[in-house]
Amino acid sequence: MRNERKVREGIVVSDKMQKTIVVAIETMILHPIYKKRVKRTTKFKAHDEENVAQVGDKVKIMETRRLSKDKNWRLVEIIEKAR
């Protein structure tokens, strides 16, 4: 069951909350009429138990049970640290 959970990669845009980070995930979609590729950004709140992620880090997050009103993702790993 654990392998069927959604996994996403994105950039940390906020770490101001305790044990929570905001991760921005960019996806490219094709505009239905103009057929131009358009960048769409979605923000997810993710649980960061040890407060290790910082703004600018590239991270991997995984879907999990509901942790609060807006939070049902958790930090799996930090792929690349910010400079």
UniProtKB/Swiss-Prot annotation:
GO biological process: translation
A single MF term (Gene Ontology): structural constituent of ribosome
Keywords per UniProt: Ribonucleoprotein, Ribosomal protein, RNA-binding, rRNA-binding
Regions annotated as coiled coil: none
One GO cellular component term: cytosolic small ribosomal subunit
Keyword RNA-binding: yes
Superkingdom of the organism of origin: Bacteria
InterPro entries linked: NA-bd_OB-fold, Ribosomal_uS17, Ribosomal_uS17_bact/chlr
Recorded family membership: Belongs to the universal ribosomal protein uS17 family.
PANTHER family named in the record: 40S RIBOSOMAL PROTEIN S11 FAMILY MEMBER (PTHR10744), SMALL RIBOSOMAL SUBUNIT PROTEIN US17M (PTHR10744:SF1)
Subunit and interaction comment: Part of the 30S ribosomal subunit.
Function text: One of the primary rRNA binding proteins, it binds specifically to the 5'-end of 16S ribosomal RNA.
Name of the protein this chain belongs to: Small ribosomal subunit protein uS17
Lineage, top ranks: Bacteria, Fusobacteriati, Fusobacteriota, Fusobacteriia, Fusobacteriales
